Design a protein with these regions (language model features):
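ATP-dependent carboxylate/acyl-activation modules
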Residues: 1-171
Length: 171
């Protein structure tokens, strides 16, 4: 969702550098970029309690965001995709990391190789069988059997809810 809000960011982590002279002040002021300030604050060593105190954002939500930071740190401890375990790669995808974000975490400051590294992450991920499944939204809350055209992709599943046609791409 964060990639779609038009802030020029890639998600909660692995973004361009956000320059903030006063993180406390930026956390206290609700803006359209505060979610990225929270990421920067976690990276700067702020605790969930400190961020909660400054933002009044629910600790449950902050804990979920902190887990994304922990995953980013685990990825950054690796220098190439082959060092990333299947479990870590799957966890990153479930948490919403794009292949680009994973590549950027592995590259650290060598940003000139991002396109090549992103493709390598994608190829390696697919080779390992870490691919999304198609799920169908149940618009009738399971009261009645419903066939809808409301579909989404997720890494949090094991099988597709729909059958593909013969070409393997069309539903």
């Amino acid at each position: 969702g964060l990639r779609m809000i038009g802030q020029g960011m890639h998600g909660f982590v692995e973004n361009k550098e956000l320059v903030l002279p006063d993180i406390d002040k930026a956390l206290r002021e609700p803006t359209d970029r505060r979610i990225f300030v929270i990421s920067k604050a976690f990276r700067a060593g702020y605790t969930i309690d400190q961020i909660h105190e400054l933002t009044k954002i629910d600790k449950w939500f902050l804990q979920k965001l902190y887990r994304i930071i922990e995953t980013a740190n685990e990825l950054e401890a690796c220098s190439k995709i082959q060092e990333v375990s299947d479990d870590l790669l799957r966890k990153a995808k479930i948490q919403g990391f794009s292949d680009f974000q994973i590549a950027r975490a592995l590259l650290k400051d060598k940003m000139e190789d991002t396109d090549k590294a992103t493709l390598q992450v994608r190829q390696d991920r697919k080779y390992r069988g870490i691919v999304p499944v198609v799920k169908q939204i149940d618009t009738l809350a399971a009261e009645y059997p419903a066939q809808t055209n409301y579909l989404y992709l997720t890494y949090s599943g094991t099988e597709n809810d729909v059958d593909y046609l013969g070409d393997g791409r069309s539903i």
